[in-house]
Amino acid sequence: MAAIPPDTWQPPNVYLETSMGVIVLELYWKHAPKTCKNFAELARRGYYNGTKFHRIIKDFMIQGGDPTGTGRGGASIYGKQFEDELHPDLKFTGAGILAMANAGPDTNGSQFFVTLAPTQWLDGKHTIFGRVCQGIGMVNRVGMVETNSQDRPVDDVKILKAYPSG
């Protein structure tokens, strides 16, 4: 396994070049340092390159980060899963919030989602670790693609390349 970067490595943004355009994500290092490090380092390693947004629910969220494309895969830089970093100041108040997808408490891996609307019922259940700072219109367009009964896009929406700034 590749080395985990030092705590001093804190790129402010991660860029997602997708098949529908570019999304720039601002990372909340102060509130969720372990989660930000995982996401930025996975991006730096090319882990997300070629992966799909495998789950899209209109007016709710777009989800990606699973190299298997099934919604059941993905690992963190720390091993399989790591603990939540829930911060009381961060709430799901609107569109463009970046958070970790999970299967319950302390089950974070590589999957993440971006909200398309307020989703207050997720407060305290998913680690918020950033926001869309450029490309929210593109995120909204991804959120409107046609999906099947399992919320999978009929036509793939891919992350062509993901990389941290700096």
UniProtKB/Swiss-Prot annotation:
Q: Name positions with the PTM Phosphoserine.
A: S149
Q: Which residues form the PPIase cyclophilin-type domain?
A: 10-164
Query: Which Gene Ontology BP terms does the record give?
Result: embryonic brain development; mRNA splicing, via spliceosome; protein folding; protein peptidyl-prolyl isomerization
* Positions contributing to cyclosporin A binding: 54-65, 70-71, 99-104, 109-113, 119, 125
* Cross-referenced SUPFAM superfamilies: Cyclophilin-like (SSF50891)
Query: What's an example of a GO molecular-function annotation for this chain?
Result: peptidyl-prolyl cis-trans isomerase activity
Q: Which reaction does it catalyse?
A: [protein]-peptidylproline (omega=180) = [protein]-peptidylproline (omega=0)
Q: What is its EC number?
A: 5.2.1.8
Null allele outcome, as annotated, is: Mutant mice, in which PPIL1 is truncated at position 102, die before 12.5 dpc.
Q: By its UniProt entry, which CDD domains does this protein fall under?
A: cyclophilin_SpCYP2_like
According to the record, the protein's activity is controlled as follows: Inhibited by Cyclosporin A.
Which Pfam family, any one of them, does this sequence belong to?
A: Pro_isomerase
Q: Which PROSITE patterns does this entry report, sorted A to Z? A: CSA_PPIASE_1 (PS00170), CSA_PPIASE_2 (PS50072)
Q: Where in the cell is it found?
A: Nucleus
Keywords, A to Z, come to:
Isomerase, mRNA processing, mRNA splicing, Nucleus, Phosphoprotein, Rotamase, Spliceosome
Q: Among the entry's GO cellular component annotations, what is one?
A: U2-type catalytic step 2 spliceosome
Instruction: Please give the function described in this protein's UniProt entry.
Output: Involved in pre-mRNA splicing as component of the spliceosome. PPIases accelerate the folding of proteins. It catalyzes the cis-trans isomerization of proline imidic peptide bonds in oligopeptides. Catalyzes prolyl peptide bond isomerization in CDC40/PRP17. Plays an important role in embryonic brain development; this function is independent of its isomerase activity.
Protein family: Belongs to the cyclophilin-type PPIase family. PPIL1 subfamily.
Spell out the subunit comment: Identified in the spliceosome C complex. Interacts with SNW1/SKIP. Interacts with CDC40/PRP17; this interaction leads to CDC40 isomerization. Interacts with RBM22.
Q: What is this protein called?
A: Peptidyl-prolyl cis-trans isomerase-like 1
Q: Which organism is it from?
A: Mus musculus (Mouse)
- List the gene name: Ppil1
